Swiss-Prot record:
Family of the protein in this entry: Belongs to the DHPS family.
GO BP, one annotated term: folic acid biosynthetic process
Pathway: Cofactor biosynthesis; tetrahydrofolate biosynthesis; 7,8-dihydrofolate from 2-amino-4-hydroxy-6-hydroxymethyl-7,8-dihydropteridine diphosphate and 4-aminobenzoate: step 1/2
EC number: 2.5.1.15
Transmembrane portions of the chain: none
Pfam family, one: Pterin_bind
Other comment: Reaction proceeds via an ordered binding mechanism, with DHPPP binding to the enzyme first, inducing a structural change which forms the pABA-binding site. One or two residue insertions within this gene are responsible for sulfonamide resistance in streptococcal clinical isolates. Sulfonamide-resistance mutations in the second loop region have a drastic effect on pABA binding.
Residue numbers binding Mg(2+): 17
Gene that encodes the chain: sulA
Residue ranges occupied by any Pterin-binding domain in the UniProt entry: 10-294
Domain of life: Bacteria
Name of the protein in question: Dihydropteroate synthase
InterPro entries, per database record: DHP_synth-like, DHP_synth_dom, Dihydropteroate_synth-like_sf, Pterin-binding_dom
Length: 314
């Protein structure tokens, strides 16, 4: 994937959480057969990539042992790969899980610690010549920030010195993201990860205030200027739901309307992202997000559009 002159439609990456305590689907796809059925559904609806995760990263979630995480994700990856050539991403920050997943058929590592959580991860990615999503993780950069305290600890040990953490606390969010990516990309280069195999994720929803989330989304073009494709996850994020609540919309996921509103609002954000040329969006409800991508991409790629043959509508 290249971020230069992006003349392709935004890729839709469908989410499959094989966890008993997942962020928004309640562990619905924890069982192998259910996960495989969900994969088929997402592909049929238009996903050309699937993101498989075996450890929840939601606020209040618990650490999953490496072997347990491997047992959750590897059978699912093998089963999907057996019947489809869809791109498969493994959502993990642990190098041993990534190694097992890549061996099972995954193509890409989605590391929410941005290569900062496990020092062996850059080498695993480099050796496999795999692609990697490097996510900006404000929770790691500002662990004492009020927006970070509700999240679990990410990574083995501490990625930054106490002096760095103290400096990070007062940085504007754009500067903090720049500092984080500078360190993460240096690790990638040192390990020998090819630049063309790197995607950047602005970390929407991780230890950010409402304003910070909105600023990063508004300025995605600035992130594109770094020369890497963008991988974006905004589906069912809390700040999107909060905006709906503040404006009187039903958001209770136990109601049909509330659940639908969450996905509709998320799809609106996807439309904005696709209009800005974001390369990949990570979503739960592929059908609604595909519609958003098709319209937004058509507008963005208007110069390449063909005129309709109106005779076909007679």
């Amino acid at each position: 994937m290249s971020s230069k002159a992006n003349h392709a439609k935004t890729v839709i990456c469908g989410i499959i959480n094989v966890t008993p305590d997942s962020f928004s689907d309640g562990g619905q796809f924890f069982a192998l057969e259910q996960a495989l059925q969900q994969a088929r559904k997402l592909i049929a609806e238009g996903a050309s990539m699937l993101d498989i995760g075996g450890e929840s990263t939601r606020p209040g979630s618990s650490y999953v042992e490496i072997e347990e995480e491997i047992q959750r994700v590897v059978p699912v990856i093998k089963a999907i790969r057996k019947e489809s050539d869809v791109l498969i991403s493994i959502d993990t920050w642990k190098s041993q899980v990534a190694e097992a997943a890549l061996a099972a058929g995954a193509d890409l590592v989605n590391d929410i610690t941005g290569l900062m959580g496990d020092e062996k991860m850059p080498h695993v990615v480099a050796e496999a010549r795999a692609q990697v999503v490097i996510m900006f993780n404000p929770v790691m950069a500002r662990p004492q920030h009020p927006s970070s305290l509700i999240f679990p600890h990410f990574g083995f040990g501490q990625a930054f010195t106490e002096e760095e953490l103290a400096d990070f606390e007062t940085l504007p969010i754009e500067e903090l993201m720049e500092a984080f990516f500078e360190r993460a990309l240096a690790r990638a280069a040192e390990a020998g990860i090819a630049p063309e195999n790197i995607l950047l994720d602005p970390g929407i929803g991780f230890g950010l205030t409402k304003k910070e989330n909105l600023l990063l989304l508004r300025d995605l073009d600035k992130l594109h200027q770094k020369g890497y494709p963008i991988f974006l996850g905004v589906s069912r994020k809390r700040f999107v739901i909060n905006i709906l609540e503040e404006n009187g919309f039903e958001v209770n996921p136990e109601t049909e309307l509330g659940f639908r509103n969450r996905d509709t609002a998320s799809a609106h954000v996807t439309s904005i992202a696709a209009r800005q040329g974001v390369e990949v969006v990570r979503v739960h409800d592929v059908a609604s997000h595909r519609m958003a991508v098709e319209i937004a991409s058509a507008i963005r790629l208007a110069d390449e559009a063909e005129n309709l043959d109106l005779k076909q509508y007679k």
